[in-house]
């Protein structure tokens, strides 16, 4: 009798995706982050579901309901901090996952890559709306500042902002709809993940060499299931350490002050994972220019397949491209630091230089260096 997992219509899909899936024998730990992101998504949906059972999306009670969760609900505090810090882990894994794709040339799988960019935008939108829900000072003013950016769109901007707000300022209607969308989006993300994996399994995984590995494949189970379990264990350990020892390390103390439309915090800034984009936004004195740069800082990823000028897929054997890549990483860390600093000298000029370098590296320097490497190898 044939094994049920290979014949049953539903089990067959799971089997072909997680058990008998042929995987390259050489993929390193950088390939763990896909499964870690899946685990993050599950953690976020589960903790979020239980938080939603006690949360009220009304401006008068939202802040109080979060306090109630932390003080009165059994293990409410751990749910709340798992959810908040789980978002940080989600973004750490996301950035490493995207970085891996850039380094090893995984973007040549165009459908998978573009689906990944859509997922990145969806996760960023979800995280932004989630940050508004506790209705603290930074929640309120973050929502006001970021939604206000849409007013830079010519002609329809102001109407668009008021339409999103559901009034003339961030108020009850805004909070209610943000809660609705924050609840809905993770399920849409789950569906998009399925599509992302569908596209990936059409081509199979890339590997560190960037060379086709069709002749050297091994089954996903047990080799990569056990490897992914190790990664998951490490990530959960880091997450629990964060939650149990310093849950507010990555948060903003201003968010423990209830939202007050009459009092602006001295420094409005988003969560740490948006700071690099926020720094790019602030480094351009023009409002529309800043918004365009903000969107392009992420959307530029879609151009990666077009900007690939090397004859080799991966950066594994390209030392000069590796230098450019790590310069880009250093630049993004600099932007993240600048995004959290006040708008004053010398941070302004550092932010502007880092923003210019970011686009210069991706659009000009990396493609040019790749062409030079082809030339050195007489290709």
Curated annotation (Swiss-Prot):
Residues annotated as transmembrane: 33-53, 77-98, 113-133, 178-198, 226-246, 288-308, 320-340, 347-367
GO terms under cellular component: mitochondrial inner membrane; respiratory chain complex III
InterPro entries found in the cross-reference section: Cyt_b/b6_C (IPR005798), Cyt_b/b6_C_sf (IPR036150), Cyt_b/b6_N (IPR005797), Cytb/b6-like_sf (IPR027387), Cytochrome_b (IPR030689), Cytochrome_b_C_euk/bac (IPR048260), Cytochrome_b_N_euk/bac (IPR048259), Di-haem_cyt_TM (IPR016174)
Record CDD domains: cytochrome_b_C (cd00290), Cytochrome_b_N (cd00284)
Taxonomy, superkingdom: Eukaryota
Protein's cellular compartments: Mitochondrion inner membrane
Binding site for heme b b566: 97, 196
Keywords, sorted A to Z: Electron transport, Heme, Iron, Membrane, Metal-binding, Mitochondrion, Mitochondrion inner membrane, Respiratory chain, Transmembrane, Transmembrane helix, Transport, Ubiquinone
Binding positions (a ubiquinone): 201
Cofactor(s) required, per the database record: heme b
GO molecular function: metal ion binding; ubiquinol-cytochrome-c reductase activity
GO BP annotation list: mitochondrial electron transport, ubiquinol to cytochrome c
Cofactor note: Binds 2 heme b groups non-covalently.
Bilayer topology term: Multi-pass membrane protein
One Pfam family cited in the UniProt record for this chain: Cytochrome_B
Additional detail: Heme 1 (or BL or b562) is low-potential and absorbs at about 562 nm, and heme 2 (or BH or b566) is high-potential and absorbs at about 566 nm.
Role this protein plays: Component of the ubiquinol-cytochrome c reductase complex (complex III or cytochrome b-c1 complex) that is part of the mitochondrial respiratory chain. The b-c1 complex mediates electron transfer from ubiquinol to cytochrome c. Contributes to the generation of a proton gradient across the mitochondrial membrane that is then used for ATP synthesis.
Assembly, per entry: The cytochrome bc1 complex contains 11 subunits: 3 respiratory subunits (MT-CYB, CYC1 and UQCRFS1), 2 core proteins (UQCRC1 and UQCRC2) and 6 low-molecular weight proteins (UQCRH/QCR6, UQCRB/QCR7, UQCRQ/QCR8, UQCR10/QCR9, UQCR11/QCR10 and a cleavage product of UQCRFS1). This cytochrome bc1 complex then forms a dimer.
Name this protein carries in UniProt: Cytochrome b
